[in-house]
């Protein structure tokens, strides 16, 4: 496999994890760009990166850059996706990949036109535990899927200027944490939900602070999702089948699942992967996708989840400034 040159656009928490992931496999980031140049310089010094751009646009023009990881705020993604994809760069973009389905469709068209790989950096699609669970499900040992229950609650202080509650930075529970729960649901459901109901509680800024979502697909598999940015919940999911149920702990970067079988109540534990290596798994799958195994990135699931989120926000009448 080719030794790909990775670049990061953004130098926050995720960019630090990306640099660490590459270091663990004997690599380092080729370059870094950031909206604040001084932060990019400090990031480069921390990780021994030799190249820093004075202007972000220089990143897209650099012929040596193969893959760009975009980790800027949600509402800036489409702007950078347009430039990166048009320049022929492969892109792994932090969730949520775009604000809505129209933006995502545009980005996908650009990727196809320029023959590059575009993917959302959704850890659930790449963590070994979920791949192992899919194998278990597909084996038929658990029978038919009945119900999925997902909870994701964080407790963020009511600082209306931070990105979580800031409408101008595309804040809100749906795009920040809902995307994880809905990606999990889509990964295990037989088809995309076509019957969706929801309720929402708004923060003072007008973004969704809390939401509950009910989903059902044509197979009549069902799911419930509860989200909150101001009420802590355990990051726990349950997948119920007719022969047993699976409990997932500390998703989306889980390492362990417990299966309880209905017939006799006996339990089985499945362990796979390491939480700390979440970005490493994304990097490995992205490079394999560029080599030809594009199914690893599950762009079809990303499209389905984005449509669900877009339709839900439309039903709420909730728009971001870029959508008005």
Kindly label every feature range from the protein language model.
Residues 53, 93, 118-120, 248:
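Hydrophobic residues in well-ordered beta-strands that form the structural core
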Residues 1-47, 322:
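N-terminal Rossmann-like dinucleotide-binding module
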